[in-house]
Structure formats: C-alpha cells, structure tokens
Curated annotation (Swiss-Prot):
Swiss-Prot/TrEMBL catalytic activity: Couples ATP hydrolysis with the unwinding of duplex DNA by translocating in the 3'-5' direction; ATP + H2O = ADP + phosphate + H(+)
UniProt cross-references to InterPro entries, sorted A to Z: AAA+_ATPase, DEAD/DEAH_box_helicase_dom, Hel308-like_dom4, Hel308_SKI2-like, Helicase_ATP-bd, Helicase_C-like, Helicase_Hel308, Hlx-hairpin-Hlx_DNA-bd_motif
PROSITE patterns reported for this sequence: HELICASE_ATP_BIND_1, HELICASE_CTER
UniProt-listed SUPFAM superfamilies: P-loop containing nucleoside triphosphate hydrolases, Sec63 N-terminal domain-like, Winged helix' DNA-binding domain
Record family assignment: Belongs to the helicase family. Hel308 subfamily.
Record's keyword terms, sorted: ATP-binding, DNA damage, DNA repair, DNA-binding, Helicase, Hydrolase, Isomerase, Nucleotide-binding
UniProt name for this protein: ATP-dependent DNA helicase Hel308
Superkingdom field: Archaea
Domain Helicase C-terminal: 235-431
Motif DEAH box: positions: 146-149
Quaternary data: Monomer.
Annotated SMART domains: AAA, DEXDc, HELICc, HhH1
Binding positions for ATP per the UniProt entry: 32, 50-57
Length: 735
C-alpha cells in the first residue's frame, strides 16, 4: 500500500466495483477508503471533510449507485452554483454507462422535478422542488450536499439549512452525505445530520504554502528562499518561475479590473515565450464566442494567443468555458482571476498566488476569511502532472511574514455557523414548511426548526419564529388559527413561484406609484424586489440616471421619496433592462454602462423569474388580469431580450433575438409567414445557415424538406451538387 492509496476492499459491493472499473479507479484515495469503512455503501449519513482533489466526487457516486440499487427512489446532488452543476453533469456522465439516467435542474422555479433517477440541482432549485412537490422528500433515497459549509453563507445558508432540516423531518429515510474541503467543526455538522465523520487532510498532490515578501518566500517550517527577479514585477516572476519548471500559475486578485490589467501586462512581457499553436486555436474560439461584447472577446482572444487569460463572473459562459478548457489543455499558462473561480469550477494549477488577502467593497477593505484562503490554496497542484502544488500569499509592505503564516497558513478555517437567525431567512423557511402542507401546527414548525443547525448551536429561536409568523400573517401569506397556521392562496402562490415573502408588501407599495402602461415603471418595480440582483451605480453615473428617469418616467421623481444608493442601483438596473428588451446589443450595454455579459445574463435571468412570479401573484392582490398579462409579456421580453413583435419568432429553436430580427426585417413576421418559406430563401439570410434553417422547418413540421435542404447544402459545400445535377441532366438528355 502506497501512502494514502488503498486497494479496493474485497467486501466492497458489486456496484462500487463496477463504478470503479468504469471510472478507471484501480486504487482508492484515503478519504474514499475511509468513506467505505464508514458505511457510505450501506446508507450511513456522512460528512466528508477532505481537501480539493481528494476524491469526494467518487464518494458521492458510490453513495448514489449503492443507494439506488438498495432502495430505488431518486438521488439528488446539490451544488451552490449553476457553473458547478454543469461541471458535475459532465463528470457524472459515467452513470449512464451503469444504466442510470442523469438530468440537470437549475432553471425555472415553477417546474417540477425532472424525470430521472439522478438529478443535479442548485440549492435554490431543490428547495423550490420541495415546495412544488411535497411528496418528493419521501422519494429521495440519497441527498448529496456539495460544499456543505455553504450553510454559513449569509445568502444561501438559510436555504441549505431549510433543505436539510426538512429532509431530516420527512417520513422518508434518505441518506445524507455532506462534502466540504473547509469545515473545521465537521463533528458538529455530522451531529446535525445524524451521521459519521470522514475527516482527512490527505491530498493526491502535497501542498507547500509560503508567504511572499520582498522577493523572498517564507515557509511555515522556517525555510527561506529567494525568488529570481527577472521582470521586477512579482506576479510575473512568480508565474514565470512556475512555468519554467513545467507548471502553470493561477493568480487570484481582488477585482475584475485588476485581473484584466495584470493579464494585459503579463501578455506584453511573457507573450512571446508562451504563445503556441494550440493557444492560437483557443484564441480563435474566443474571438467567435457568442453573447460576448466584441471588444471583450477580441481582448481575451489576443491574450489567450499569448498564453495568458483572465477569468471572472462577468464573462459570458462561452468565454469562461474557453479559458477553462485552454488552461486545462496547457495552452494558457497563467490565468488571473477573482476569487469566484476558487468557489466555482475545479481548475488546478502548479502554483497559486494570492495577490492580496484583502477584499474591497463600498470603499472599505477587510481581510479575507481563512476559509477563503484555504479554498484558493486548495487549487494548487494538478493530480497526475505535479509532484507538489504551491500556494503563495503576498504580504504587504508593513506585514510581518510570521503573522500571515499564523493567521492564514497555520490557522484553521472559521467554524461553520448557522445563518438562519435573520427574519428574512426564517420567513422563507416557515412559508416553505406551511405552504406545501396547506396547514400545520405550531408544534410542527417547532419540530422542523428543532432539526436546524441553528437549534443545535444556539437553541430554538422561538421569539424570532413568532415575529416571522407575525410578518407572514400581516402580509396575508398565512392565517393564524390558534395553535395552527394555514397558508392563504396568496401564500401558496408565493411559495410556488419561490419569491421572497417580502416581495408582497414591496409590490403592494410600489403599484401605488407606477403606471403599468409605462415599461420603465414596470422594470423599476422588478428592480426593487428583494430577490433582484441590482447593478451598483457609481457617482459619475448618477446624473445620467436622473436624465434617464426624466426621459422615461418623469413622475417617478415625485413619487420616490429618496434616491439613495439602493434606489439608484434599482434605476440603473431598470435602465439596462430597458435597453435589453429594446434589443440593444451586449456591446452597446457594455459600452454605455460597463455591464459585463455574465452579469447581464444573471440579472436578466433573475428579472424574468421575478416578473413571471409577480404576474402569478398579481390576481391574489386584487390587481386585474391586464396587470398579470402585462407582467407576463414583460417576463417573456426580458427572457429573450426583444421587442413585442419578435415574441413569436424567438420561440423557434435556434432563433435568438438577433436571428429573429433578421427574419422579421426579411418579411417573416410570424409563424404563419414562415409556413411557406423555402429553405433556400432562409439560408440566404445573414446568420441563417443550414442548421438554423433545418430547425425552423422542423419546428414547422416540414422535417423531410429540412433534411433535404441540409443535405443539399452539405453537397454544395463539398462542390458535389453541381456535378450531381449536371449528371442528372445528362441522364435525362440521354433518355
């Protein structure tokens, strides 16, 4: 037995052995072996606390295949982010080779659970599924919670805690498995879910950690080493040293702007050394990325060609994917990123550099948490490629290296603590208990509340629960009937569309001041909702935003009491949404307001969900059907980013906002207009190639014509069509 590696035990189940064979796993990592010993195959609840890259995903797969074989039912794998969901979907494809259908569920909160035995979902989506399908909890045989330490996140924590508590309270006997790389109080989390601990510090690639100051690397063991000063810029010299040794570097920095600036500087200095044919292939892919402002796509393409890239949440998914693939392939040697990458996709590097241990928000700065440092440092070391990984935290001029060593390298991550105490989280939690059942006793609410992490750590928050129930009652979402609480029709609808309960009083107040005949008013309403992702407005933008209000909705200035930072952020969000539904391009929106495509797509997705949800609850607030219809249409326009006349066309698969406008301007203004369109005519239009023409014709039920048109186009591309047609004519003449 090599250190940390174990043979698959003879007592492992057939399902585990089959999975290992298909996955190419010949020997088990230490945490994997420990999980088998702890009973992961037998349905034991577990908390697995082990470093990044130590095989936690395989443990999850073992739990899934054994649980489904043993008990049937369904398996859910929960993640905090959509990007992680898509990454896991790819790595879980092995399940299809075991006859298990896999689905991903991250979107519409109104949809029920997908029909598949294995589902990957975000926390929020699974929470909504429990509300839409109350019986689901009893049919889940295993629930895997990735990043279970997220229970201490202010935003997602209450949602995750609510999910686990309701699963513990359900009549079913689902196996619960929590996974984390940073959970120092794993024992307490295990006690919460009634499970065992699998705790290991073993890594497939050993980690070396240092503090960098004045071109010296300080080790926790007391070692000291000089870093060659080649470029006189520490990020370049630290990256270049790793590259020289056959590695790659991942540099985490505190802002998007700095990530871009450093990447450009690195490309100028290192580009000639790092450029390669493979890098140019990925560069070409980046330049063709869909949905990205041309300036951003071209900028990133030029950097990738030089073997350098940057990565942040503002990039569209297509560009983020290209950067990630180029880095994994080794075509890009250095990526400058914001810390969001550390919490998202798995992208390891030989050397990780933490450019600053501060974060900057609203003009203030504060040190990052130890858990955040550990998350970034955990990306160091590529399994199968590196003998070791290095994590380097950069000291400031007045820092003492030993303080950073004790404060970050040697320090344990912060305890995982419940965030359920806030009224907002508790209101959401309680409505999620009451609405699916229709009516419950206060004792039932206290029973589920007693199964929360908060209750374990601090006791049952009876006073806060009472205040939360009072709010829900005052807003018309529940009725208190002695010792029982019943959901109203409004409450059930709010729970079903998954809106924050506070949306109801906000909606009631805002409708007093707006006109539903004014699109900007409606978009401002959406932007004020508690769930909305708002765009912060800078001081320089405030004058332009006031002008926008005067142009779009002059009476808003008299109806809004105060335009502080939150209100200005809502105005900016409404302005950008108005541009979007008026078909402004991503380039225009980025150029005018500096909104990156990734942020725009996130905002659009949230706004569409809120608008749709408001359209559903409007009748329960006494608003007429016209209001519901207007909000429903606005929701569809936000989803597709179009003016009203294109709503029919964008429903056709493959026809987005740009192609829909092209079809409209060419005279195809409705489905009826397209019913008689010839494939050849469609393919002559800009951006309507054979594939899109085929999708249009198939949508119209003209399948044979679609296939024939695509075949003719392929022959034409190969230069065979004229030859075949000429041959056919010759044959006719011969007859």
């Amino acid at each position: 037995m090599s250190k940390g590696l174990y043979d698959i035990p003879s007592w492992a189940t057939t399902e585990t052995r089959t999975l290992a064979k298909l996955a190419g796993v010949e020997r088990l990592f230490e945490p994997q072996y420990m999980a088998l010993q702890a009973g992961v195959e037998k349905g034991e609840n577990l908390v697995v606390a082990a470093p990044t890259g130590s095989g936690k995903t395989f443990i999850a797969l073992v739990a899934i295949v054994n649980s489904l074989a043993r008990a049937g039912g369904r398996a859910f794998y929960l993640v905090p982010l959509k990007s992680v969901a898509y990454e896991k979907y790819t790595s879980f494809s092995i399940l299809s080779r075991m006859g298990l259908k896999l689905k991903i569920s991250v979107g519409d909160f109104r949809e029920g659970p997908p029909e598949a035995p294995v589902v990957i979902a975000t926390y929020e989506k699974f929470d909504s599924l429990l509300r839409v399908s109350p019986s689901l909890a009893r049919n889940v045989s295993v629930l895997i919670v990735d990043e279970i330490h997220s229970v201490s996140d202010p935003k997602r924590g209450p949602i995750l805690e609510s999910i686990v508590s309701r699963m513990l309270a359900s009549a079913g006997e689902a196996q619960l498995v929590g996974l984390s790389a940073t959970v120092p109080n794993a024992g307490e989390i295990a006690e919460w879910i009634g499970g065992k601990i699998v705790e290991s510090s073993w890594r497939p690639v050993p980690l070396r950690e240092y503090v960098f100051k004045e071109y010296k690397l300080y080790s926790p063991t007391g070692g000291l080493r000089e870093v060659p000063r080649v470029y006189g810029l520490y990020d370049l010299d630290l990256a270049a040293e790793a590259i020289e040794d056959g590695g790659q570097a991942l540099v985490f920095t505190y802002s998007r702007r700095r990530a871009v600036t450093l990447a450009k500087r690195a490309a100028k200095r290192l580009g000639r050394r790092l450029s390669s044919r493979e890098a140019r292939v990925y560069s070409a892919e980046a330049s063709r990325a869909e949905g990205a402002p041309r300036s951003v796509a071209e900028e990133l393409a030029s950097l990738i060609a030089a073997g350098i890239a940057y990565h942040h949440a503002g990039l569209p998914p297509s560009l983020r994917k290209t950067v990630e693939e180029a880095f994994r392939a080794g075509a890009v040697k250095v990526v400058y990123s914001t810390p969001t990458l550390a919490a998202g996709v798995n992208l390891p590097a030989r050397r990780v550099v933490i450019d600053s241990y501060y974060r900057y928000e609203a003009g203030f700065r504060e040190p990052i948490r130890v858990a955040e440092y550990k998350q970034m440092a955990g990306r160091a070391g590529r399994p199968g490629l590196d003998e070791f990984g290095e994590a380097i935290i950069v000291a400031e001029r007045l820092d003492r290296p030993e303080d950073l060593i004790s404060g970050y390298i040697r320090a344990p991550p912060e305890r995982v603590e419940s965030r359920l105490a806030g009224l907002r989280g508790l209101r959401h939690f309680i409505l999620g208990i009451v609405a699916p059942e229709g009516e419950v006793s206060i004792g039932s609410i206290e029973k589920v509340s007693g199964l929360t992490l908060y209750s374990l750590q601090r006791g049952l928050p009876r006073e806060t629960i009472a205040r939360a129930v009072e709010d829900l009652s005052a807003w018309g979402l529940v009725e208190v009937k002695g010792w029982r609480i019943a959901a109203t029709s409004l409450g059930r609808e709010v729970a079903a569309v998954y809106l924050d309960p506070e949306s109801v009083p906000v909606f009631r107040e805002e409708v007093k001041h707006l006109s539903f005949d004014n699109e900007f008013d409606i978009l401002y309403l959406i932007s004020t909702m508690p769930d909305m992702v708002r765009l912060p407005a800078t001081r320089r933008e405030e004058e332009r935003l006031l002008e926008a209000i005067l142009d779009a909705s002059p009476r808003m200035l008299s109806s809004v009491d105060w335009l502080g930072p939150e209100e200005m952020a809502a105005v900016k969000t409404a302005v950008v949404l108005k541009l979007w539904i008026d078909e402004a391009s991503e380039d225009t929106i980025y150029g005018e307001w500096g909104v990156h495509t990734g942020d725009l797509l996130n905002m659009v997705s949230t706004a569409e969900w809120i608008a749709s949800g408001l359209s559903r609850i409007a009748p329960y607030l006494g608003l007429n059907s016209k209001v519901s219809h207007i909000l429903s249409v606005i929701a569809r326009r936000i989803k597709h980013g179009v003016k009203p006349e294109l709503l029919q066309l964008v429903e056709i698969p493959g026809v987005g906002r740009v192609r829909a406008r092209i079809l409209f301007e060419a005279g195809y203004r409705s489905i009826e207009d397209l019913a008689t369109a010839r494939a050849e005519d469609l393919m002559r239009l800009p951006l309507i190639g054979p594939s899109t023409a085929r999708q249009i014709l198939e949508f119209l039920g003209r399948v044979d014509e679609a296939r024939e048109a695509e075949a003719r186009e392929m022959l034409a591309r190969k230069g065979l069509l004229s030859y075949l047609e000429g041959d056919a004519v010759a044959g006719e003449e011969g007859e």
